[in-house]
Amino acid sequence: VSARSMQQVTTSCYPEPLNTRPIMNILTDMNVLYDAYLASMKGSAWKEEPQRFEMNFLSELTRLSRELEDRTYKTSESATFIFRERGKELLIHGGRMRDRVVRHVLCDEVLTPRLKPYLIHNNGASQKGKGISFARENFEKDLHNYWLEHRNNDGYVGFVDLSKFYDNMQHDKIIESVCPKIPEDAAWLMREILKIFEVDVSYMTDEEYANCMATKFDSIKYHMEILEELRTGKRFMRKSVDIGDQVSQDLGVYFPTPIDNYAKIVRGCKRYGRYMDDIYIIGETKEEVRSVIDGISKQADNLGLFINERKTHIAKLSDTFRYLQIRYTLTDTGRVIRRIAQKNITRERRKLKAYRHLVDIGRMTDENVEECFRSWLGMQQKYMSNIQIINMIKLYKELFGGEITWKTNSRLSYLTAQCSKTSG
């Protein structure tokens, strides 16, 4: 093989810098904007604002196309609210319909396809064909493969959690990392969107402002404690992204890539994965795993991110440990035992009882409840024991009186029949 052909093979493994390629400005294409509009309507067509947008969608899309072409587009002001899920509080900015259309264009046509080649396979969040089930399955494969290689469960697994992940993404580092990989026609829009995420820190002293980038930021605490009259627009902190924004989801997938590359390439970790801010490393010794975690901590520090010391820990593979809300144990015979966390079942039982009240006052229908319960049980049943499933089905029948029909010869169909026999 000639040196020239080898050079072609080597260079073809890495994407060409995209801002050097002549490309069509897809941001202003009406067909692309229309597809983005349809995508934005999914799941929200019943809301008032999307319906108003739909009534004049041609003129709205034409105006957006003109603003994007002239580079006069600005993100609209939106409502801010606190969303509570699984005991966590998240600060969400409800994006306007026109802004959601622009986000779909930028992410679906530029960010997602252009950044995907730089991601590792075991980066499982917010990507087509991947998701939380994908991440869990890959974690289980890594556990099985460890046993197949070593024929024992004497190894260790380390877990790393990035604290206030979205709150502490620095805009300058995002621009430095992302913009060279996308065309300039999209880079200006990326910079414009980041402006809406800037945090008004006019209340800070000069010393606090000088150190704010190196200090962990908490958007919930900021929203609850800093009064509106203190946010005068005098100075802004170029840090934090909105967790509810589609651009933020793409950034959450891509931004910690240096951490992934450090673990997979520099340290050569065979069994490593990341789901947004949740990371795992499997190794033969505790010292090996600790060394990788220390290196990850340094990489996170370079990115301006913070390690959650309370949630970062190392466990024996033979012990019971939790990843992505599932409890795992690797036995000495190579079997992976997985169980749903009990608090998840308790939470769903409370939800069913709350749904009963909502049905009684007319805010939900029995069909809505069945759809919610069917979705939850269908997703979680592979992590539940037969007794747990039967008890959940019994509670559903006690509260709503109906019986859900499952796929014939499926596990849920069999257990539903067993539940009917015992109750009968």
What does each of the following model-derived ranges do?
Residues 1-62, 413, 418-424:
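Non-catalytic, polymerase-adjacent accessory regions of viral genome-replication enzymes
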Residues 2-10, 95, 100, 104, ...:
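Right-hand nucleic-acid polymerase module
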Residues 21-23, 109-170:
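Active-site-proximal segment of RNA-dependent polymerases
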Residues 45-51, 76-101, 118-131, 201-253:
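Short, conserved non-catalytic motifs in the polymerase core
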Residues 53-77:
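Amphipathic alpha-helical blocks
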Residues 142, 149-276, 280-295, 315, ...:
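Conserved polymerase palm-domain catalytic core
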Residues 182, 297-305:
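A common structural junction motif
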